C-alpha cells in the first residue's frame, strides 16, 4: 500500500479518530501528531518527503479535524489514543513525532509507553506549556465566544515576521483548520494542557529523543527546549530559524533534521 488511505478507528473510550496512512505497509512506521487547533494536514511536507521509505501515519487529535470531540480529555488520553491507533493498524513499534500539544503527547509516550516506540521527537513543545490559569481562561473564552479572535491573531504565535504566511498555501490551510476546529474540542484540549506537566518525569525517558525548538517561538521557547535537553538522558537538541510551527515555516530544514535522526536509529 503506497497511496494514502484514510480510516476511522475506535479508541478505548468507544470514540472515533480519523487516521491517514501513507507508504509501504512493511516499512518502519512514523506517527505524526498535530498541534492545538490544527489537523493532520499540517504535516503534508513531511508526509510527502518520507512516504516512499516509511509507513507514515497522521491523525486528527481528538476534538480536531474529523475526530470525535471527547469530554474530560487528559494528556494520558492523548497518549492512549496513539496506542489505540497503533493497535488498530497492527503496528508493534513506531517513531513518534509531535509538535506543540503533540510534543507533550510524545513526552508522555516516552515516559509511560517507551516499549512501543523506537524514538520520540518533541518539536516546539515543553514539559509544561504556559500556565494552568491561562489555559483554563482560554477554554472558557472559546466556549463563550468561539475561535474567531484566536484565528485572527494566530499568525503572530505560529509564524515569524520573516515568513510570508499570507502567500504560503499550507500556512493558510492550517489557519483555516483552526477556524474549522470545534470550539468544544479546542476547549477540551486546553483543559488537558492546563493539567499537563511532566517536568518531574523527564529523567525516566530512555529512548532516543529529538528536541526541536524554534528560534523565534514565543509559545514554547528555546529555554523550554534546553530544559528538556538537560533532563532527558538520550537526546539530540536542534534549533530551527522559525516560530511555533517550525515544520511549516521551515519544512525542508525540519525534514532534514528529523529524517537524519530517524535514520541514525535504524
Curated annotation (Swiss-Prot):
Record-annotated AB hydrolase-1 domain positions: 28-250
Catalytic activity: (4,5-dihydro-5-oxofuran-2-yl)-acetate + H2O = 3-oxoadipate + H(+)
Anything else known: This species can form two 3-oxoadipate enol-lactonases in response to different inducers. The one shown is called enol-lactone hydrolase I by the authors.
Taxonomic placement: Bacteria, Pseudomonadati, Pseudomonadota, Gammaproteobacteria, Moraxellales
GO molecular function: 3-oxoadipate enol-lactonase activity
Domain of life: Bacteria
GO biological process: beta-ketoadipate pathway
Name the UniProt record assigns to this protein: 3-oxoadipate enol-lactonase 1
Encoding gene (name): pcaD
Amino acid at each position: 500500500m503506497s497511496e494514502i488511505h484514510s480510516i476511522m478507528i475506535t479508541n478505548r473510550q468507544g470514540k472515533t479518530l480519523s487516521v491517514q496512512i501513507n507508504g509501504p505497509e512493511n516499512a518502519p512506521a512514523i506517527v505524526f501528531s498535530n498541534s492545538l487547533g490544527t489537523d493532520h494536514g499540517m504535516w503534508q511536507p513531511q508526509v510527502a518527503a518520507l512516504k516512499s521509505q516509511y509507513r507514515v501515519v497522521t491523525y486528527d487529535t481528538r476534538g480536531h479535524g474529523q475526530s470525535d470531540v471527547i469530554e474530560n480529555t487528559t494528556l494520558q488520553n492523548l497518549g492512549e489514543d496513539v496506542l489505540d491507533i497503533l493497535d488498530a493498524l497492527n503496528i508493534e513499534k513506531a517513531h513518534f513525532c509531535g509538535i506543540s500539544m503533540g510534543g507533550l503527547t510524545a513526552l508522555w509516550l516516552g515516559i509511560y509507553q517507551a516499549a512501543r516506540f523506537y524514538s520520540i521527537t518533541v518539536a516546539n513543545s515543553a514539559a509544561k506549556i504556559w500556565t494552568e490559569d491561562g489555559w483554563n481562561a482560554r477554554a472558557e473564552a472559546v466556549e463563550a465566544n468561539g475561535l474567531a479572535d484566536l484565528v485572527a491573531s494566530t499568525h503572530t504565535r505560529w509564524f515569524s515576521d520573516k515568513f510570508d504566511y499570507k502567500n504560503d498555501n499550507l500556512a493558510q490551510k492550517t489557519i483555516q483548520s483552526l477556524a474549522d476546529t470545534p470550539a468544544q474540542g479546542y476547549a477540551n484540549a486546553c483543559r488537558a494542557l492546563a493539567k499537563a506537566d511532566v517536568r518531574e518525569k523527564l529523567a525516566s525517558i530512555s529512548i532516543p529523543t529529538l528536541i526541536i525548538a524554534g528560534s523565534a517561538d514565543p509559545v514554547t521557547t528555546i529555554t523550554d527546549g534546553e530544559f528538556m535537553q538537560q533532563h532527558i538522558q538520550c537526546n539530540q537538541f536542534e534549533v530551527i530559524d522559525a516560530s511555533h510551527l517550525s515544520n511549516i515555516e521551515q519544512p525542508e530544514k525540519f525534514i532534514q533534521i528529523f529524517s537524519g535522526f530517524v535514520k541514525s536509529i535504524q
